[in-house]
Each structure stands twice: as C-alpha cells, then as structure tokens.
Amino acid sequence: PGKTRLINHFLIDNAWYLVDLPGYGYARTSKTKRSEFSKIITDYVLKCEKMHFLFVLADIRLEPQKIDLQFIEMLGMNGIPFAVIFTKADKLSKTQREKSVERSRAALAEQWEELPRMFVSSSQHSTGREEILGFIGECLNV
C-alpha cells in the first residue's frame, strides 16, 4: 500500500495510456508528503484534457473514508467521469464484502443522486478483472 510516488504512464496496446497516480490517502509517509501527493493528483486530474475515465481505488475493508468522499465530490463538481474499484476483496467473506459495498453506496447516496459504477476486485483471485477490463473497453469506444 502507498507505494506509488510518481505519476506512471503505461502504454497499452500502442493505443492508450493507463496512468497510475500516487495515493492521496493512506501512505507510509509524512503528512507533508501526503499533502504534496494530493496536490499532484488534483492538478493532474483537473488539467488532463485527454482523460477518458478515472478509477478511485478504495480498500473494501475500510469504512468509507472522508478523503475518498471529498475526492469523489471534487470529481463530480468538475465533471470528471469516474468509477470506484473496491480492492482487497479476498480479505473479506462474501457477506462482509456486500455489507462494505452497501455502506459505501449509502455514504455516496448522501451526495449523489445517481451513484457511480462500482467494481469489487482482488488481485489475488482476479476477482472483477473481466468486468473492469470490459468497462475500460466501453470507455475507450466512446
């Protein structure tokens, strides 16, 4: 967790870029450094003209975090299309995952009339992989 320190661009199929941004929340670093990451992310997101879509990654084991809700609100206020990917699904039972996603839906419903698309994922078991890749394909075909 909290390993990305730079903006990393990955060219996919010689056609589009997947951009990995530093995390703005949890990171094993100083508060000052996290604040710098937050500014880098916000500047990039607000100034990137060719961005098709943004994925907000959130640890499914945690309650909806204030910083995530604030970031999502900023995306909405600026008309930036996004979806939420809940990570580390392998760490919870199916019932726990469902409860966690429902808590996040309820928290987002306080701010949003229409909820963003949400995916549950696990890198350990490839959970959600096909759905996310399919969604990326839909976004790129627009």
What does each of the following model-derived ranges do?
Residues 4, 34-38, 69, 126-129:
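Amphipathic alpha-helical transducer elements in NTP-driven molecular machines
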Residues 1-14:
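Switch I (effector-binding) loop of TRAFAC-class P-loop GTPase G-domains
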Residues 16, 23-25, 61-63, 88-93, ...:
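Conserved nucleotide-binding/hydrolysis micro-motifs of P-loop NTPases
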Residues 91-142:
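Canonical P-loop GTPase G-domain recognition
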Residues 27-32, 63-69, 94-98:
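Conserved ATPase-coupling elements of RecA-like P-loop NTPase cores
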Residues 33-61, 73-85:
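Inter-motif core of Ras-like GTPase G domains
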